[in-house]
Amino acid sequence: MALMSKAAIVTGAAQGIGKAIAARLVKDGMRVAIVDINQEAAVAAAEELAGQYGADTMAVQCDVSQEEQVNTAVQKVLERFGTVD
């Protein structure tokens, strides 16, 4: 219950380990931003996790090697969730 309604950003979350981490967080009640360089895959993962767990998720396209994109992604998450825990 300690994670309920908290918010997280998970990078590389459209597949593999990142997606597994995001799934665990939403299963525990967290709001999760699925961040990935592949927008379509991020949207698909966010929709899948939201449907599977009834979670509040969002997809954000971001190349984490580009500082400007990271700043923009964080801003989008803060606008949606208000905070990142």
Task: Cite the ranges covered by each PLM segment.
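The beta1-alpha1 cofactor-binding region of Rossmann-like NAD(H)/NADP(H)-dependent oxidoreductases
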Residues: 39-43, 61-75
